[in-house]
Amino acid sequence: MGNCLSSSDQKEAKDRSVAIDKQIEEDSRKFKKECKILLLGSGESGKSTIVKQMKIIHQNGYTKDELLLYRLTVIKNLVDSAQAMVLALRKFKMEPEMPENRENVDAILQYRVDADPGATLDHAMARKVDSLWKDPIVPAIMERSSEFYLMDSAAYFFDNVNRIGQSDYVPNENDVLRARSKTTGISETRFNMGQLSIHLFDVGGQRSERKKWIHCFEAVTSIIFCVALSEYDQVLLEESGQNRMAESLVLFESVVNSRWFLRTSVILFLNKIDIFKQKIPKQPLSKYFPEYSGGPDINKAAKYILWRFTQTNRARLSIYPHLTQATDTSNIRLVFAAVKETILTNALKDSGIL
């Protein structure tokens, strides 16, 4: 059958097509949409750190008064970590090699942080913690860090203990990014990314908090799901016998196959890649996931963990993975440039523009 359209009809059709394409481009440029992003993941996966990065990147960072609000948390994190080290020494029946540290450990264990927000770390205690951290026995303890709970930022705080111990100590943004306090309930952060008005909801990661997530589930544009790659050899804070990575897999499976998220894209942050790189040569992934056969190769190990997560996606949602280091502002800035494109595309589809 011949072509029934005249040359003038064809030109008109082509012009109309070009006009439609231009209109779509114009609509996209003018497009302004509120996007609801749900930030999910198990406890200590880095969700709250991502929220802090959004404040630094998109909300002009922290004022001095806001930084001071984190001073007590930083001091508590430091002291808790030092006490965890002392308890680990006793658990493994080890003793410090430096004589002064054999006396320091009792003082560290008995030290209590003043609950007053204006409290500072005692100078003498700061020196004791610094001395313990420099003790030759410490590497032997750290080799067994998967056998006791020690927060990821412990080494960072120990390295900065003398600065933190100053009477006029004001946390900097790096301190704030590493400060850890349990997230309870639901917090909302609002910021703009280009033509997108983002409403980012951070929900508590601990088990007791998960029943509250239901309130956030309606009309979600995207989910950002955080997984700490470094947790493959760790146990849950809530239940010492449960592997953290296995728990994250169960949680991810329940999220991606939920009836609430049938049309939602999932942005998967494989977080704490820096700690993962340090840990893989020392703690074989195959010890915890026997079917893994890639050895200490960081890329193979990360790909295997990604594969484990994507295998749970029976609902066949679109999953966009990113390797992240939530404490590194430049890394998160780059990652969110890519995330913005994903969210924008989904928002345009939801609005019928694409």
Curated annotation (Swiss-Prot):
Residues 36-49 are annotated as: G1 motif. Residues 33-354 form the G-alpha domain. It holds the Pfam family G-alpha. GTP binds at residues 41-48, 177-183, 202-206, 271-274, 326. Residues 198-207 are annotated as: G3 motif. Residues 267-274 are annotated as: G4 motif. A lipid is attached at residue 2 (N-myristoyl glycine). SMART domains: G_alpha. One of its GO terms (biological process) is adenylate cyclase-activating G protein-coupled receptor signaling pathway. CDD domains: G-alpha. A lipid is attached at residue 4 (S-palmitoyl cysteine). Mg(2+) binds at residues 48, 183. Residues 175-183 are annotated as: G2 motif. One of its GO terms (molecular function) is G protein-coupled receptor binding. Residues 324-329 are annotated as: G5 motif. GO terms for cellular component: cytoplasm; heterotrimeric G-protein complex. InterPro entries: Fungi_Gprotein_alpha, Gprotein_alpha_su, GproteinA_insert, P-loop_NTPase. Keywords: GTP-binding, Lipoprotein, Magnesium, Metal-binding, Myristate, Nucleotide-binding, Palmitate, Pheromone response, Transducer. Belongs to the G-alpha family. PANTHER family: GTP-BINDING PROTEIN ALPHA SUBUNIT, GUANINE NUCLEOTIDE-BINDING PROTEIN ALPHA-2 SUBUNIT. Guanine nucleotide-binding proteins (G proteins) are involved as modulators or transducers in various transmembrane signaling systems. GPA3 plays an active role in transmission of the pheromone signal. G proteins are composed of 3 units; alpha, beta and gamma. The alpha chain contains the guanine nucleotide binding site. This is Guanine nucleotide-binding protein alpha-3 subunit.
